[in-house]
Each structure stands twice: as C-alpha cells, then as structure tokens.
Design a protein with these regions (language model features):
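Active-site flanking residues adjacent to catalytic metal/cofactor-binding acidic residues
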Residues: 36, 112-115, 175-177, 217
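Gly/Ser/Thr-enriched, mixed-charge loops and adjacent short helices
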Residues: 46-167
Length: 225
C-alpha cells in the first residue's frame, strides 16, 4: 500500500477488528482499514477483511473493484510504513461505557477465552482493571491454534465451559479469532450463542433498564430479538 502512495500504518500489536473499524470511523484522516486474518477458520486459512471510512464492512461492489485491481504477481517494490497505536483510545471508550463501580464492587470471577486470537490479553486486561477476577485460557502464542477452530460455537467452547465449572466463575466469555463475535458460558457451564446473547441483552435493556426505541440487528440474529 505504501509503494502505491498510501500513508499506510501497521498496528503496534494485536488488534481486534472492532478496534480497527472504530479507528477508521473516528479518525478523519483514515479512508479505510485492512485486516489480514481468517476470523473463525482454522490456523491454515488466511484472508483479507476490508473496512471503509465509516468502519463498516466494505460493500461487495467495492470489494469486486479492489480485487480486479490486484495484480497477478506480487510487486517487489516496498514503501516505508509507520506504526499506529490503535487500542488505547478504543479501550478507554469501552471502559467509559460500562459501570466500573458496579463491576469493582461485585468482583465477579470471569473466564475469558480469546481462542488464541487477536483479543488475547486485551479483554482480560480490561476486565481486571475494572476489578474483575479474570482467568484467561487459550491466551498464549500458538500459531497453529492448538488445532482449535476459533469460533464461539460448540464444540470449540468446551474448554471454556469446563473452566467456568472448575473455577466457580460466574460466566465465561468466548471470542472468535478476530474478536468480532462473542459467546457466553453461564455459571452452570451452559453455552449461550451470540444470537441468544443479543436477545438477553435486549431483554435486560427493556425490562430492567426501562429503555425503548428502535433496534437494528443483523438478519441472522433478528428472529431472536
């Protein structure tokens, strides 16, 4: 990208795709973002995820145009590129949105399973700063993912279910490889899918918090809500 005249920056460390999209949306100097990864696919897979200047998944027609411009062979030319700290501001914003005092007072024990993906150390670290007692599994550096498919679905959440039960945690949080999907394990070791989790959150906001208004949901999860 630098060799083609773009001011390209590379993340200083692991970067969950929500942080990448958030940066693209909130930095007026950014026209788009690219992540190399394979989401929930096994370690042998690789792909490219493109976000537009609004931090959203680029539409198909735009991606088709980009793909048509990709040369058949890689260029030998390389331009200079800088680095960017993408996490600090994003994490600060997340911490601002939650009730830190309530979390600190409750000191919940939570199992976090980043599935060897981009969120390792990040979500666990944030929860610890907020006062939670956190147990992180699958957080070490394994380029082969130890054979795990980093998807928050059965049977790949079995280790988190067992960790919740054995540690007496109140919940487990399971994220996929690029950390844009999350699943929940309850205190009894039962898995709650991403779509059902959306419905639980909506129920809490309406029934407990008394909130009302319009809700936008992906089509694949809207029937639950």
């Amino acid at each position: 990208l630098s060799s083609w005249g773009f001011d390209a920056r590379v993340s200083e460390g692991f970067c969950p795709i929500p942080a990448l999209g958030w940066t693209a949306a909130h930095d007026e100097g950014v026209i788009g973002a690219v992540m190399i990864g394979a989401s929930g696919a096994p370690a042998g897979y690789q792909g490219v995820c493109v976000r537009d200047a609004n931090g959203l998944i680029a539409p198909g027609e735009f991606l088709a145009r980009v793909e048509s411009l990709v040369p058949g062979e890689a260029s030998d030319s390389r331009g200079a590129c800088g680095s960017a700290a993408l996490l600090d501001t994003y994490i600060s914003e997340l911490e601002r949105l939650v009730d830190a005092d309530a979390i600190s007072a409750a000191r919940p024990r939570i199992v976090v399973d980043p599935m060897y993906g981009t969120s390792r150390g990040i979500l666990a670290g944030m929860l610890r700063r907020l006062g939670a007692d956190v147990i992180e599994i699958h957080g070490d550096d394994r380029t082969d993912f130890a054979g795990l498919h980093p998807r928050p679905v059965e049977p790949w959440v079995d280790d988190c279910e067992q960790a919740v039960m054995s540690s007496g945690a109140c919940a487990g949080l399971v994220l996929d490889g690029d950390a844009d999907r999350i699943g929940l394990v309850d205190e009894k070791g039962r898995f709650v899918s991403t779509h059902r989790l959306y419905a639980l959150v909506m129920g809490h906001l309406v029934e407990t918090r008394g909130m009302s208004g319009r809700v936008a949901m992906p089509l694949n999860g809207s029937t639950y809500v």
